[in-house]
Regions:
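Non-ligating segments of multi-cofactor redox enzymes
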Residues: 1-203
Length: 203
């Protein structure tokens, strides 16, 4: 892509983003991607739509390939914005100093975040919530060691027969989803306020 094409693409993306924001504010269309989990630092759906120019830099720099582009099924106005795809990779920002997506964003659609003394995100920075499908879980324990906040509970916790997730501790990083060996995964990741995530689904 040459400079002229890049400028044209950027202009078109900005125009679509601006139109989307106006439609949301006018109440013509909804702005929520019902099942999408956004990258760390996306604290307002409208902010993302206002500022994201869909340049793809955050997706390109993600070291675990956790980010991908939202498609039309995720919501027409969200098409092209970054979302988390934990089956490709989980977000490691709670494990180590990595906010590459934030650093790469040229428009501050992804805002800077406070970190601990090792550069990691704190446990109370939540982007989603994981839930184990008890009917599909094979109790392999792969999810347990990769969880950065000790949110995985072993079988027997609250009389459950499979591994489960303590939703009060889960940051929604998706590392457990990535680690799950079950075809199609036995763990789902939801937005933090998604009602489908509560209570734990039982087999």
């Amino acid at each position: 892509m040459n400079r002229r094409e890049a400028l044209r693409y950027g202009g078109e993306a900005a125009a679509v983003t601006a139109l989307g924001t106006l439609l949301i504010r006018a109440g013509v269309v909804g702005g929520d991607a019902d099942e999408a989990v956004f990258p760390p630092s996306v604290d307002a759906d409208e902010r993302l739509l206002e500022r994201c120019i869909k340049c793809g830099r955050c997706v390109q720099v993600c070291p675990t390939s956790a980010l991908t582009f939202a498609d039309v099924p995720d919501g027409l106005l969200h098409s092209g914005v970054p979302i988390l795809d934990p089956e490709n990779g989980g977000c490691i920002a709670w494990n180590e100093a990595c906010l590459d997506c934030v650093d790469a964003c040229p428009t501050d659609a992804l805002r800077d975040l406070p970190t601990d003394d090792r550069g990691r995100l704190p446990a109370d920075e939540v982007i989603g919530v994981a839930q184990v499908d008890a009917g599909r879980c094979i109790n392999c324990s792969n999810c347990d060691p990769v969880c950065p906040t000790d949110a995985i509970r072993e079988p027997g916790y609250e009389d459950r027969e499979t591994f489960s997730v303590d939703t009060d501790r889960c940051p929604g990083c998706g590392r457990c989803v990535e680690a799950c060996p079950v075809d199609g995964t036995a763990i789902e990741l939801y937005p933090p306020d998604e009602e489908a995530a509560y209570p734990v689904r039982r087999g």
